[in-house]
Amino acid sequence: MTRKALAAGLADLGIDLPDEAQQKLLAFRDLLLKWNKTYNLTALRDPAQAISHHLLDSLAILPHVGSGNLLDVGSGGGLPGIPLAIARPELSVSMVDTVQKKTTFLQQAVIELALRNVTVHHARVEEMQGQYAQISSRAFAEIGLFISLTRHLLAPNGRWLAMKGVRPDDELKALPADIAVEAIIPLTVPGLDAERHLIILKAGS
């Protein structure tokens, strides 16, 4: 039933993944729930809910993820970074979190799932270096703070991908004048009865 629920959800999202990737997604779900008993990585305990609220919710943004390297900020339990990395093995994904128990879990997940395209950083994002074509966040911070903490890491012509619940109009109105909202995309996540939006932003010249 679990496998069927995942396959049906992916079909609803218009995402076609090979069996191996689907098996890895479920293995990640199992690993997350196993470690959650000790590390408190997520409030969810139900395996079926974890498919909709974690796996499918993360993958709902997949059609809007480009080919350039991606930094996932405040990755926590690896969402959306690990599902994206499983679905797109050619995509270079870096994940950063300040909480050591979370990055310990992420490093173990990378090893157990053999994710060669993922790098884990235990650090404060404002102290990181490098350049990323895409910077994502899910339940990390208010959009203005997310941008100010990561702006030095955004490559020229790069994009921020901010995952939000209800449309964050107040946050968008408060953005600096040189930040452009490229798109506000309502997301429909199978099995998730809640508003979801992807906000895509760019830095002005």
Swiss-Prot record:
EC number from the UniProt entry: 2.1.1.170
Annotated GO MF terms: rRNA (guanine-N7-)-methyltransferase activity
Compartmental location: Cytoplasm
Primary localization class, coarse: cytoplasm
Superkingdom of the source species: Bacteria
ATP-binding among keywords: no
GO CC terms of this entry: cytosol
Enzyme class: transferase
Keywords: Cytoplasm, Methyltransferase, rRNA processing, S-adenosyl-L-methionine, Transferase
Residues the record lists as binding S-adenosyl-L-methionine: 74, 79, 125-126, 138
Family: Belongs to the methyltransferase superfamily. RNA methyltransferase RsmG family.
Primary role: Specifically methylates the N7 position of guanine in position 527 of 16S rRNA.
PANTHER family reported for this sequence: S-ADENOSYL-L-METHIONINE-DEPENDENT METHYLTRANSFERASES SUPERFAMILY PROTEIN
Protein name listed in UniProt: Ribosomal RNA small subunit methyltransferase G
Species of the source: Dechloromonas aromatica (strain RCB)
Gene coding for it: rsmG
